[in-house]
């Protein structure tokens, strides 16, 4: 195996891992803090993708062609806002009443998932639609005999920026520190005056917003449709569990591991077999370390 092939596969693995990470970040926030298995998380990816598509159509119809290159920059925060707003509505109207009822919340969010998919089919149609990338994202960077597409490099930069902003929010802002406190010990945070209800709403909106950004980035690598999110939601759950529920650092490590391992295994097998091998590895690993890569440390009384 030549060096260029190794570098190319490594880049593809990191690229895949970064996309999965962007999806799993939002899931880690909601699943880790609220213990809610949000089966509609994939549909927030779809919402972010269709928000990007709608903004593209508005630029094509109502703005001069010279402005088209800027639509994607505007689509990123817009996808976050739209997905976060819908997530906030979902939390306040449905999820809030299902805390500590895991089976009911699983069924309810699955129902919301089906409703959102059908709404997308009604509005946009069942066939997939394409989003045209701006001109400045076409082409690639040639280095060491390997072409690094600008689209993939942009997604990597977007993921790094998202991680940086998330950690700044969680560790440097009062709102983020309250969210961390609720994640670590909900009862103690409540006793100290933290409004866990407000924190839960904010966390669900934040997680949904990150899914929206993931949907926006996915428009750069393929067409989009009503079932876009279902192709990624299983991998996202595996990443969150492998990394350690509620552990963002573990989620980052697990996403990169899953992306790189899957890419190299696919070289000698198929995508389906590679996914089975990775899934078997995760099951075996969790038998050895049930808390994941970055588990919660606890003390026991003798």
Task: Write out the residue ranges for each language-model feature.
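Membrane-interfacial amphipathic/re-entrant helices at transmembrane-helix boundaries
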Residues: 1-23, 51, 62-74, 101-106, ...
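Pore- or pathway-lining transmembrane helices of multi-pass membrane proteins that form conduits
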Residues: 43-50, 96-121, 229-241, 270-289
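Single transmembrane alpha-helix segments in multi-pass membrane proteins
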Residues: 6-55, 89, 93-104, 244-245
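Helix-loop-helix "hairpin" substructures at the membrane interface of multi-pass membrane proteins
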Residues: 147-224, 248-253
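Inter-helical junctions in multi-pass inner-membrane proteins, predominant
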Residues: 2-11, 148, 169-174, 200-242, ...
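Cytosolic-side transmembrane-helix boundaries in multi-pass membrane proteins
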Residues: 123, 135, 184-191, 195-198, ...
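Alpha-helical transmembrane segments within multi-pass membrane transporters and channels
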Residues: 65-112, 119, 253-258, 289-290
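Transmembrane helix-bundle core of multi-pass membrane transporters
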Residues: 97-98, 102-172, 199-202, 264, ...
């Amino acid at each position: 195996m030549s060096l260029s092939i190794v570098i190319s596969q490594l880049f593809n693995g990191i690229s895949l891992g970064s996309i999965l990470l962007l999806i799993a970040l939002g899931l880690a926030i909601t699943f880790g803090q609220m213990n809610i298995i949000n089966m509609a998380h994939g549909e927030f990816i779809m919402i972010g993708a269709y928000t990007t598509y709608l903004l593209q159509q508005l630029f094509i119809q109502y703005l001069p062609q010279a402005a088209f290159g800027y639509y994607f920059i505007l689509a990123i925060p817009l996808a976050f806002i739209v997905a976060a707003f819908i997530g906030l509505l979902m939390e306040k109207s449905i999820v809030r009443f299902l805390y500590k009822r895991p089976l009911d919340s699983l069924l309810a969010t699955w129902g919301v998932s089906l409703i959102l998919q059908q709404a997308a089919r009604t509005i946009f149609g069942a066939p997939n639609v394409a989003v045209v990338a701006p001109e400045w994202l076409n082409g690639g960077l040639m280095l060491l005999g390997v072409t690094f597409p600008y689209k993939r490099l942009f997604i990597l930069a977007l993921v790094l920026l998202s991680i940086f902003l998330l950690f700044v929010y969680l560790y440097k802002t009062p709102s983020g520190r309250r969210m961390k406190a609720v994640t670590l010990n909900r009862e103690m945070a409540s006793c100290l005056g933290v409004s866990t209800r407000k924190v839960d709403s904010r966390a669900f909106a934040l997680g949904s917003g990150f899914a929206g950004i993931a949907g926006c980035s996915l428009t750069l690598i393929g067409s989009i449709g009503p079932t876009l999110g279902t192709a990624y939601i299983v991998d996202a759950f595996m990443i969150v569990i492998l990394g350690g529920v509620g552990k963002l650092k573990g989620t980052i490590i697990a996403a990169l591991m899953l992306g790189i391992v899957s890419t190299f295994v696919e070289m000698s097998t198929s995508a389906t077999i590679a996914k089975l091998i990775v899934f078997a590895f995760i099951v075996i690993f969790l038998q050895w370390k049930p808390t994941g890569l970055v588990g919660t440390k606890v003390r026991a009384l003798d």
